[in-house]
Amino acid sequence: MTDKKVTRLRRARKARLKMHELEAVRLCVYRSSQHIYAQVISADGSKVLASASTLDKALRDGATGNVDAAKKVGQLVAERAKAAGVTQVAFDRSGFKYHGRVKALADAAREGGLEF
């Protein structure tokens, strides 16, 4: 693995440990070069309560690797999380910088009604 990836994974592990101590439901984000994925995971980490990604049929047709697609994923995951009864989450950025697509997804999820 590259040093950049190892560093990102170390940051993610530290953040997840803190979220586990707080027993918080978390909104976990992963981004690849072409897609972005978001999951709302239960406090004990055993169950996915809601999820959305640019691979969903509703979002697959348009561009999938840009800020606009991330905003749509954020709105969709917020809508699905509220339907599952979740309104308060901890934002798990998986070690990625809070910038660009990750920030756009987080802002859209907040606008959709999730509290971080």
Curated annotation (Swiss-Prot):
It holds the Pfam family Ribosomal_L18p. Part of the 50S ribosomal subunit; part of the 5S rRNA/L5/L18/L25 subcomplex. Contacts the 5S and 23S rRNAs. GO terms for biological process: translation. Belongs to the universal ribosomal protein uL18 family. One of its GO terms (molecular function) is structural constituent of ribosome. This is Large ribosomal subunit protein uL18. Keywords: Ribonucleoprotein, Ribosomal protein, RNA-binding, rRNA-binding. HAMAP family: Ribosomal_uL18_B. One of its GO terms (cellular component) is cytosolic large ribosomal subunit. InterPro entries: Ribosomal_uL18_bac-type (IPR004389), Ribosomal_uL18_bac/euk (IPR005484). This is one of the proteins that bind and probably mediate the attachment of the 5S RNA into the large ribosomal subunit, where it forms part of the central protuberance. The gene is rplR.
